[in-house]
UniProtKB/Swiss-Prot annotation:
<dbReference type="InterPro" id="IPR005653">
    <property type="entry name" value="OstA-like_N"/>
</dbReference>
<dbReference type="InterPro" id="IPR020889">
    <property type="entry name" value="LipoPS_assembly_LptD"/>
</dbReference>
<comment type="subunit">
    <text>Component of the lipopolysaccharide transport and assembly complex. Interacts with LptE and LptA.</text>
</comment>
<protein>
    <recommendedName>
        <fullName>LPS-assembly protein LptD</fullName>
    </recommendedName>
</protein>
<dbReference type="InterPro" id="IPR007543">
    <property type="entry name" value="LptD_C"/>
</dbReference>
<dbReference type="InterPro" id="IPR050218">
    <property type="entry name" value="LptD"/>
</dbReference>
<dbReference type="GO" id="GO:0015920">
    <property type="term" value="P:lipopolysaccharide transport"/>
</dbReference>
<dbReference type="Pfam" id="PF03968">
    <property type="entry name" value="LptD_N"/>
</dbReference>
<dbReference type="GO" id="GO:0009279">
    <property type="term" value="C:cell outer membrane"/>
</dbReference>
<comment type="similarity">
    <text>Belongs to the LptD family.</text>
</comment>
<dbReference type="GO" id="GO:1990351">
    <property type="term" value="C:transporter complex"/>
</dbReference>
<keyword id="KW-0998">Cell outer membrane</keyword>
<keyword id="KW-0472">Membrane</keyword>
<feature type="signal peptide">
    <location>
        <begin position="1"/>
        <end position="22"/>
    </location>
</feature>
<keyword id="KW-0732">Signal</keyword>
<dbReference type="GO" id="GO:0043165">
    <property type="term" value="P:Gram-negative-bacterium-type cell outer membrane assembly"/>
</dbReference>
<comment type="function">
    <text>Together with LptE, is involved in the assembly of lipopolysaccharide (LPS) at the surface of the outer membrane.</text>
</comment>
Length: 813
């Protein structure tokens, strides 16, 4: 009797064929009815994945109210039930012929297993020839939403055919959308299905027609069309992208990406992915012949991949190339010049990690992507860079070393001629083709050089229940080998082998006090955590040292406890200074959550710090304010959790020398019901070199649920200095059990010149099937912090990154 259940997997195979194309995004099913369209059947076994895996080895039990016929032609009548593992088949009547293999199940035919549920009028077939037919089917997917019906299903072995079938994730009483197909062929052995004349309906209106397409019915990938993306923008006009997936092999595939932009023409793109036991990779290329707006060919290539050499070593590479300096602006929708980089980095290297060590050998190169700048804005290329770090405790001591050897190169710089200024009274009125012109006049010839930096240290971390004390001594040696071009570049003195050697001593100490207290009827644990950090570094003249990759750190609370002001090894500031800081927290005793935290600190400079980065050979390194004897700016951080929904934070820096604030930021967040959120922020920064205002911005964003189905989204990002918006977003979202529609209108700064662009984004999400239109998630997730509520709880990036290529030697010890 075990073979009597052979027909049952067929409806499952066909039912999952369309949802197999569903997107990977998390879906909200909260608006769906709590009751399944097909409730579970009485007497059916409970869902059990383990029983589903073993069903072929389990016996079949048959029961019914009455049994008649003969031993070769048994007939079961009334409440017939067949059970095997997690499978259940019920019917009013079941007739069988054990000699011919024929069977007929009639009246209220029901089937259920761990992932699938079905009702039908009749099922018949022959077990010997493995042919089956089921008529008038209604089905439901149990593990994920999805239901539909079919007029009939025919099965011959592993091949089946469904007639006049539908699929939707909507409630059957309100099918907002459904897919209809008069004929679907399914091959379980090959793992694909073929639909003919399929139509996607929204309501009763057909919106997409597929005369023929193949699709997967299991995890095996199949070649075919993916859902399109489309949008509208002032830069590109109507924008349509039709992905075509190519399943080339089990471990590699490709996607063709033809794209039409009404203002530019056809762009041809492709994406190739590969996977093997030791690694994976992905390469993407795009080519636009004869861009209508630029009158030239455009293109890009991006590659990323890795290979695991063994348990300690991994090779990684990331290659980026674009055809011109306008490409990023024209074909990305980020805040170019404001929130995106002016250059692309390509990196290749091998990296190792052990219990007490990290090491690596890599090389990188930079490409300019901002047409308003010349090559002077690019960082130096590292070709190559080798580094090694080691640290290990020895009793009460801890010892370690950081070593790095780098060869730096740089492309020569050529003058960029800006376009003619606008007429009086006009602003940014020039045509798109009136570009900056890159001349052949050399602006600066860069040489090359190599640098060795070694920093051994030894520390003695001591601590108790309410205190810690860590004295540290380090020695830093840095040496260069420069070519004549670089060595004779002002203000360098012509020395081709300059070097620097100096000790670094620090003492880090802190105390911890706490007490129990009560405020407004709530019990708190109040802490007081004073901290002291003394740093001494003798002065060394470093004017003859080039500046390759060194920049001043942005002054912050964390900077109070670093042993250098710089990110790289080209400068090591002299110091005789003491940091005094204190932190106080209020922790709720019932759950340990932090109600309020306050931190403040200041550096006391006992002497002038003579080392600066000013007037270096590298204009891109910028400049900094000299550090004089006295006091640094006060740095204060505060975070206040008003309640479980409302939080506030602030950062403030006040300079006692200028009696002005150097930096101020205020941010507040309110969490609404139904995952809504409101963000408000203000940011201010003063230019310390000329005391002018450098940045003054206000940022307001929200996701406001109007009701369970409708919500509004928006952002207003405004520059108070320029008196103009940087980005404006407005949109609405409509959500239902099975369909979501999002529409956005966006106006944003598209380049460093402050020119604005407009775009319209519309996306349809057929839950459980796919989405088409322009992806709005990426835009909203960037613009509205907390658009995905889980983003609020992600750990922010820190300087103690585990990526060895990003390891900062100045954070050792």
């Amino acid at each position: 009797m075990r073979r009597a259940l052979r027909l049952l997997p067929l409806p499952l195979s066909i039912a999952i064929c369309l949802p197999a194309m569903a997107a990977d995004k998390p879906l909200n099913w909260g608006l769906c009815p709590a009751v399944d369209p097909l409730p579970g059947f009485d007497g059916a076994p409970a869902a059990d994945p383990k029983a589903a895996e073993m069903r072929q080895q389990l016996p079949t039990d048959i029961e019914g109210d009455q049994l008649s016929g003969t031993s070769t032609t048994p007939q079961y009548q009334g409440n017939v039930a067949l059970k095997r593992g997690d499978q259940f088949l019920g019917a009013d009547n079941l007739r069988m012929d054990t000699e011919t293999g024929n069977y007929i199940a009639e009246g209220n035919v029901r089937y259920q297993d761990t992932s699938f549920r079905m009702v039908a009028d009749r099922a018949e077939g022959n077990q010997d020839t493995d042919t089956h037919k089921v008529t008038n089917i209604q089905y439901q997917l149990v593990e994920r939403r999805g239901n539909g019906d079919a007029e009939s299903v025919d099965l011959q072995g592993q091949v089946g055919q469904m007639h006049r079938s539908t699929y939707t994730t909507c409630d059957p009483s309100q099918p907002i959308w459904r897919v209809r197909a008069p004929e679907i062929d399914v091959d379980n052995e090959e793992g694909f299905g073929t639909a003919r004349n399929a139509v996607l309906q929204i309501g009763k209106v057909p919106v997409l027609y597929f005369p023929w397409f193949k699709f997967p019915i299991d995890d095996r990938r199949q070649t075919g069309l993916l859902f399109p993306q489309f949008g509208l923008s002032g830069r590109n006009g109507f924008d349509y992208l039709q992905p075509i997936y190519l399943n080339l092999a089990p471990n590699y595939d490709a996607t063709l990406l033809p794209r039409y932009m009404s203002k530019r023409g056809f762009m041809f793109g492709t994406e190739f992915r590969y996977l093997y036991e030791g690694g994976r990779g992905e390469v993407t290329g795009n080519y636009l012949p004869n861009d209508k707006l630029r009158d030239k060919d455009r293109g890009s290539v991006f590659y990323s991949g890795y290979h695991n050499v063994n348990t300690h070593w991994q090779a990684r590479s990331s290659i980026s190339w674009v055809s011109d300096t306008r490409y990023v602006e024209d074909f990305t929708s980020r805040l170019n010049g404001m929130g995106s980089a002016s250059s692309l980095q390509s990196t290749v290297g091998i990296y190792g990690t052990g219990e007490t060590w990290t090491a690596g050998l890599m090389a990188d190169r930079w490409q300019l992507t901002d047409y308003t700048l010349d090559e002077q804005a690019l960082p130096y290329n590292r070709q190559p860079r080798a580094y090694f770090t080691w640290e290990k405790p020895f009793g009460i001591f801890e010892a370690g070393v950081y070593a790095e050897a780098v060869r730096f190169t740089h492309d020569d710089s050529y003058f960029v001629q800006p376009p003619s200024p606008s007429a009086p009274g006009e602003t940014n009125n020039r045509d798109d083709n009136d570009e900056y012109v890159r001349t052949n006049i050399r602006n600066k010839e860069y040489g090359s050089g190599a640098r060795l930096d070694v920093k051994p240290y030894i520390s003695m971390p001591l601590s108790g229940a309410a205190w810690f004390l860590t004295p540290t001594v380090a020695w830093r040696y840095t040496a260069y080998q420069l070519d004549s071009t670089l060595a004779n570049t002002a203000p360098l003195t012509g020395n081709r082998t300059p070097s620097r050697s100096l000790p670094i001593a620090s003492l880090d100490a802190g105390l911890y006090f706490d007490r129990e207290t009560s405020l407004f009827g709530t019990n708190y644990l109040n802490t007081l955590e004073p901290r002291m950090y003394y740093l001494y570094v003798p002065y060394r003249d470093q004017d003859d040292l080039p500046v390759f990759d060194t920049r001043p750190f942005t002054f912050s609370y964390g900077q109070l406890f670093r042993d250098t002001r710089y990110t790289g090894a080209d400068r090591q500031n002299d110091a005789n200074q003491l940091t005094l800081a204190v932190t106080s927290r209020w922790l709720r005793q019932d759950d340990g959550r932090e109600k309020l935290s306050l931190s403040a600190g200041q550096i006391l400079y006992f002497s002038d710090s003579l080392v600066t980065i000013n007037n270096s050979n590298n204009s891109a390194a910028g400049s900094e304010q000299t550090v004089e004897q006295g006091k640094s700016a006060w740095v204060a951080d505060a975070n206040y959790m008003i309640n479980d929904r409302w939080s506030m934070g602030a950062t403030y820096q006040w300079n006692p020398n200028s009696r002005k604030e150097d930096l101020a930021s205020l941010r507040t967040r309110y969490l609404l019901n139904n995952d809504g959120i409101i963000n408000l922020a203000y940011r201010y920064r003063r230019n310390l070199t000329d005391n002018s205002d450098q940045l003054k911005q206000a940022d307001f964003s929200f996701l406001y649920p109007i009701n369970p189905s409708w919500s509004a989204v928006g952002r207003y990002y405004y520059s108070l200095l320029d008196r103009k918006p940087l980005e404006i977003i407005g949109g609405v979202q409509w959500d239902s059990c099975c369909l979501a529609v999002r529409g956005l209108v966006r106006r944003f700064v598209r380049n460093r010149d402050g020119e604005m662009d407009n775009s319209i984004q519309i996306e349809f999400v057929l839950k459980g099937l796919s989405s088409f239109g322009q992806n709005t998630d990426r835009t909203l997730r960037r613009a509205i912090l907390g658009y995905y509520r889980d983003d609020l709880y992600l750990v922010p990036p820190s300087n103690t990154t585990t990526n060895p290529d990003d390891y900062d030697p100045n954070l050792i010890p």
